[in-house]
């Protein structure tokens, strides 16, 4: 059971390093110092409660179910890899998948908040993608809103009898799109359009992101289904443990 997980996690980290060390344009994360300090503070304050709950959940998970550590590492590596696959955008910045849907479905949205924040902090400090002052805003969109959307949508799909594969696809895809809708809102609030205000600015940012992000979201959804099927083939024991704890949904 553990060898396939170790292989995937190792492959994910290797691919991530290759992409991370390659030259690239600015990442989609809001860069350091870009937001006015007032808005940077607001997003930090909104993000922190989710992070603290997530830290508590991670500590409890590791204490009660240490067997799932490798699965947690896999979810982290999956997020690292997908968020490193940067594609140039029409704005001169870049778009990328988020990879938060899988972890949210396995461990719940709050544990995924911690994983996503770790990814963002690593990128900010070592790769100059995003920033420390804007970490609250970036984490709120990618590590809070995205996982919550994935978890809630997956729950609703299963409640209404949608197949697991379709549910996973929709959850991962919408987690990606929700992240960039939130980012568009953040930028629009900080930099409203001179004539059309916040709504006009939001439409501009969202339409620019949509050019690359919609295809990426669909691709991420399909890839998440592939990984989900792999886990259900080779890691049934770990998934059963999570299901018994109530962290994952069948």
Curated annotation (Swiss-Prot):
Ligase found in the keyword field: no
Membrane topology summary: Multi-pass membrane protein
Coarse class of the protein's main subcellular location: membrane
GO terms (BP aspect): cobalamin biosynthetic process
Subunit (UniProt): Forms an energy-coupling factor (ECF) transporter complex composed of an ATP-binding protein (A component, CbiO), a transmembrane protein (T component, CbiQ) and 2 possible substrate-capture proteins (S components, CbiM and CbiN) of unknown stoichimetry.
Family: Belongs to the CbiM family.
Protein name: Cobalt transport protein CbiM
Encoding gene (name): cbiM
């Amino acid at each position: 059971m553990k060898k396939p997980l170790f292989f995937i996690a190792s492959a994910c980290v290797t691919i991530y390093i290759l992409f991370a060390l390659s030259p690239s344009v600015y990442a989609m994360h809001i860069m350091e110092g870009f937001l006015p300090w007032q808005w940077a503070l607001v997003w930090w304050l909104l993000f922190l409660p989710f992070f603290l709950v997530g830290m508590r959940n991670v500590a409890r998970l590791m204490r009660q179910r240490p067997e799932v550590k490798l699965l947690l590492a896999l979810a982290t590596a999956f997020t690292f890899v997908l968020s490193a696959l940067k594609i140039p955008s029409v704005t001169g910045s870049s778009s990328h998948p988020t990879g938060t849907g899988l972890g949210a479905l396995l461990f719940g949205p709050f544990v995924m908040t911690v994983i996503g924040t770790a990814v963002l902090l690593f990128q900010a400090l070592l790769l100059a993608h995003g920033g420390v002052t804007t970490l609250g805003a970036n984490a709120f969109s990618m590590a809070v809103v995205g996982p919550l959307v994935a978890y809630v949508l997956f729950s609703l799909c299963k409640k209404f009898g949608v197949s697991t594969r379709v549910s996973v696809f929709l959850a991962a895809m919408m987690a990606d799109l929700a992240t960039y809708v939130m980012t568009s809102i953040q930028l629009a609030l900080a930099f409203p359009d001179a004539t059309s205000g916040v709504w006009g600015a939001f439409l501009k940012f969202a339409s620019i992101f949509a050019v690359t992000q919609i295809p990426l979201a669909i691709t991420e959804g399909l890839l998440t289904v592939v990984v989900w099927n792999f886990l259900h083939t080779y890691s049934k024991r770990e998934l059963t443990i999570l299901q018994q704890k109530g962290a994952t949904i069948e």
